Amino acid sequence: MSKKAFFITGTDTDAGKTLVATGLLAAARLRGLSTLGLKPVAAGCTRTEQGLRNSDALALQAQSTLPVVYEQVNPVALEAAIAPHIAALQEKRSLSADRLAGFCRSSLRQADFTLVEGAGGWRVPLNPSETLANLAQLLRLPVVLVVGMRLGCINHALLTVEAIRNDGLPLVGWVANVLDADMPVLEENIASLAQRIPAPCLGVVPRLSMASADAASAHLDLTPLLDA
């Protein structure tokens, strides 16, 4: 099997990108594949004795079978839990898609199965002229969309799908991640998305009482990605 790499985006902040990404990495590991998860830029990092650390990036590192240091997983760590471009301005740092792509490129072909997780949604700014979509374009990665299932998600999902396709990247799969267990007509919403999104649904992750990569992996189908 050739090495596979994908860009993980979501309909919004807290859509469940990291839960799904770590679930997919766990599923790949169970198939005997080497894995690597990357989070090129992360805001909302905590100061530790080792430096700034982000919980999402640490989760991706934990599901990576390759022995990578934290800085390889998350090369740009920002402290404030706000939009990355604003956090960078506050820290007097600059973000660019080209620089972030450079961090990723050296790692993309190291593992059998690599995921690059964005921050927030598809159009999150990096600077006045670039967004995270530009990073995905530079890396030329097929995209997996995580849809946070709550009221309003159909519009968010379809607009994101449209943006991904307009940016010239293939959408190779999507995941319904249930954020609101009491969401009215949940199944009908998922069916509406499946009818309208031109990519396979990789699974429906329910609201988990104990959210973990292994628990999420039980609800995900890796086959469409390995066949992509």
UniProtKB/Swiss-Prot annotation:
Binding site for ATP: D14, A15, G16, K17, T18, L19, D56, E117, G118, A119, G120, P206, R207, L208
Enzyme's top EC category: ligase
Residues of the active site: K39
Enzyme Commission number(s): 6.3.3.3
Catalytic activity: (7R,8S)-7,8-diammoniononanoate + CO2 + ATP = (4R,5S)-dethiobiotin + ADP + phosphate + 3 H(+)
Source organism, top-level taxon: Bacteria
Subcellular location: Cytoplasm
Regions that span the bilayer: none
Pathway connected to this protein: Cofactor biosynthesis; biotin biosynthesis; biotin from 7,8-diaminononanoate: step 1/2
BP terms from Gene Ontology: biotin biosynthetic process
Keyword Nucleotide-binding applies: yes
Binding locations of Mg(2+): T18, D56, E117
An annotated GO cellular component: cytosol
Major location (coarse): cytoplasm
Assembly description: Homodimer.
Function of the molecule: Catalyzes a mechanistically unusual reaction, the ATP-dependent insertion of CO2 between the N7 and N8 nitrogen atoms of 7,8-diaminopelargonic acid (DAPA, also called 7,8-diammoniononanoate) to form a ureido ring.
Family to which the UniProt record says this protein belongs: Belongs to the dethiobiotin synthetase family.
Protein name per UniProt: ATP-dependent dethiobiotin synthetase BioD
Organism expressing this protein natively: Cellvibrio japonicus (strain Ueda107) (Pseudomonas fluorescens subsp. cellulosa)
Name of encoding gene: bioD
